Curated annotation (Swiss-Prot):
Its main location: membrane. It comes from the Eukaryota. This is Peroxisomal membrane protein PEX17. The keyword rRNA processing does not apply. One of its GO terms (biological process) is peroxisome organization. InterPro entries: PEX8-like. It is a multi-pass membrane protein. Coiled coil: none annotated. Involved in peroxisome biosynthesis. Required for the import of a subset of matrix proteins into peroxisomes.
């Protein structure tokens, strides 16, 4: 129920009440009587206006409302301004329900509209009433058909309302606002955001996009909104360190008019961006960067002073709201980058700046524990723009001029320079995680020097965790994703050849404990694929292939039979073909590696692998879980057959099939 539909004191339909309302609106009061609360005045408007029978009286009251020093003072509070919009909206909805013989609904609306349009004073005073009319029209239309036919807004009036609102809005923003109070300067934007929930202001009757963005962004970043990214720090300081008090203050902040409408503003702003010039968009992006950096720094300080703030529900909710707002606005910039032609320098710089902003607020995404669609869209769109600079060299990376500077690599160096790799603060870990996610995309196209001096060194820092594994797990997984992406690039052969021995030695101990079984198998397969003939790494150092297979074979021999895979590193139990034991996982990695072996030694490797499989039942006698050991044997036999009969080289397939049917015979030779 609307709060303004609660009857005010003495809310009957008398001339006395009408006079009383007018006195209230003018700020007059009976000598000795207490001043009437603004809410009571608004309630009287809701109950009295729909029952007025004389159009002249309605005309009078509307004029009094617009000129009221109580409702629309020069230093009006934005909350009071929003209340007036809500109250007038409720008034019109009530008028549509009033059955007493009064002025007809259409005549009542026409009178209100004419009084508002004729008002010659400041335009900002007209906007709450126009917004109330527009929102009420939406409410009445949205209610749908009822048993009692409700009157609706005439089509012509709908159009006139929208046109009058847009004209008034543009006039308000075109006037010099330097000597006006913050409230009266920003009131038009708040009104615009209010009705944008139900009316498109971007069509045939469109607002002034640039002015809306200019004043609107000032509003949402002001003390009425996000406070340039410092709101949380201020509210926690005011709470004196008490979590409950801080929660109450933040909850109140989230309900303030501007903050409550951030979602709507962000979508309007995102749609407006495509209509303004590039230089102005650049200024918008610069301001967003500053907000993001401020929020990151204040959150760092908060978490240092009180680590429990990481789990403070209201603080996290506020951060999510802020993230959503900033990403939706930047989504408009991303759309513009992907659809409009522009100077390449500005094109690349805007994408660079978008990633700068996302880098600062990635800690919020990390805090959420899941990706956010708008964030992902901006992130990958900006990366696409930066990597487009490599387009002329994609087919042959060897043609990249060694001294050519790329914006994407400048960002890579900047991220490395600002990352605190040794820090245990969650916000610092989030920054490193962002850098690794970016490097995973960049490593496939950039200079070898960037890979060797920036990307791989950063990833190396987290490849082999020795402690705090659960806390570091996202970083470990991201670091390995970077390396695996780099291993797949043929032109990284020299760098990869140097890395492989160390990397193989570091990967093998990660299962079990860090890697899930499928992560381990994937990592081994990627390494084998990188070092096997006829790869560029194999041409660089042919010994690496044998080193990798020998290391894997040793891991197979050293892994006991019948030990279950830890629950912490398994995948969903609904997935089929899950290896039953740790040894089955390691052996599976070896089996999957066999198709890369040279045909001259392929049969020997098949036999050696089969010997280890066939040894399983014997080894199971000493296993703690004999049933699991037998399941391991069955699994490995099946996987061996899948490999042999699967999609492998035809020549290898012929050798493997012949071997399979004579495998009980002795195969002569040594590995």
């Amino acid at each position: 129920m609307n709060k303004y539909l609660v009857p005010p004191p003495q809310a009957n339909r008398t001339v006395t009440n009408l006079d009383l309302l007018i006195n209230n609106l003018r700020g007059s009061s009976t000598p000795g009587a207490a001043e009437v609360d603004t809410r009571d005045i608004l309630q009287r408007i809701v109950f009295i206006l729909p029952t007025i029978k004389n159009p002249l009286n309605l005309d009078l009251v509307i004029k009094e409302i617009i000129n009221s020093p109580r409702l629309l003072p020069p230093l009006i509070d934005l909350h009071d301004y929003q209340q007036l919009t809500d109250a007038f909206r409720a008034t019109i909805k009530r008028k549509a329900l009033v059955t007493d013989p009064t002025i007809s609904f259409e005549a009542w609306l026409e009178t209100c509209f004419q009084v508002i349009t004729r008002f010659a004073g400041p335009g900002w005073k007209k906007l709450p009433l126009l917004a109330g009319l527009i929102l009420a029209d939406y409410d009445i239309s949205a209610d749908g058909p009822t048993l009692e036919r409700k009157p609706g807004f005439p089509s012509k009036l709908k159009h006139l309302l929208k046109r009058e609102f847009v004209t008034t809005f543009d006039q308000c923003l075109s006037i010099d606002t330097r000597n006006r109070s913050d409230a009266t300067k920003w009131v038009p934007v708040l009104a615009c955001i209010s009705i944008a929930q139900v009316y498109s202001l971007l069509g045939d009757v469109a607002i002034n996009y640039r002015r809306f963005l200019q004043v609107g962004l000032d509003l949402i970043f002001s003390n009425y909104g996000l406070e340039m990214g410092t709101a949380l720090a201020r509210l926690h300081a005011e709470s004196g360190g008490d979590a409950t008090t801080a929660g109450g203050l933040i909850g109140k902040k989230l309900k303030e008019p501007v903050v409550a409408l951030l979602n709507t503003f962000a979508h309007i702003a995102s749609s407006c961006i495509v209509h303004v010039d590039i230089d102005y968009i650049d200024r918008i992006q610069n301001k967003i960067i500053l907000v993001c950096e401020n929020q990151a720094e204040t959150w760092r300080i908060l978490t240092i002073e009180s680590p429990t703030v990481m789990h403070h529900q209201e603080s996290v909710q506020y951060l999510k709201w802020e993230l959503f707002t900033l990403c939706i606005i930047m989504q408009g910039i991303a759309n513009m980058l992907l659809t409009q032609k522009m100077n390449q320098f500005m094109y690349l710089q805007l994408a660079y700046k978008q990633l700068q902003a996302l880098h600062s607020i990635y800690f919020i995404v990390d805090q959420m524990g899941s990706q956010f669609a708008a964030y992902d869209y901006v992130f990958f769109s900006a990366i696409d723009v930066l990597l487009s600079e490599y387009a002329p060299y994609i087919k042959n990376r060897g043609t990249i001029p060694p001294n050519k500077e790329f914006v994407a690599e400048r960002l890579a160096a900047n991220l490395a320079g600002t990352s605190n790799v040794g820090s245990h603060l969650p916000i610092d870990r989030s920054r490193v995680l962002f850098a690794l996610n970016y490097y995973e995309q960049l490593v496939t196209v950039c200079h070898d020097s960037c890979v060797e001096t920036i990307i791989y060194p950063m990833a190396r820092s987290f490849l082999y965790p020795t402690s705090d594994i659960q806390q570091l797990k996202p970083l470990v997984e991201a670091a390995h994703s970077v390396i695996l992406a780099g291993l797949a690039v043929p032109t990284n052969a020299v760098v990869n050849a140097k890395l492989i021995p160390e990397y193989m030695g570091g990967v093998l101990p990660l299962f079990p404990g860090v890697f899930s079984w499928n992560q381990f198998v994937l990592a081994i397969q990627s390494i084998v694929n990188t070092v096997s003939p006829p790869s560029e790494v194999f041409k660089t150092n042919q010994k690496l292939f044998r080193l990798v297979l020998d290391s894997l074979m040793k891991k197979c021999r050293d892994t006991p039979v019948g030990i279950p895979v830890p629950h912490s590193v398994t995948v969903s139990q609904e997935q089929e073909d899950i290896p039953p034991t740790q040894r089955a996982v390691v052996m599976l990695a070896l089996i999957n590696s066999l198709p890369y072996v040279d045909i001259r030694s392929f049969e020997l490797w098949l036999q050696e692998t089969w010997n280890m499989i066939e040894a399983t039942p014997m080894l199971a006698e000493n296993a703690p879980n004999k049933e699991l050991a037998h399941a391991e044997h069955e699994f490995l036999v099946l996987e061996m057959w899948k490999m042999i009969s699967g999609n492998i080289d035809q020549r290898l397939n012929d050798v493997a099939i012949r071997w399979w049917y004579k495998k009980n015979a002795r195969v002569h030779g040594t590995l």
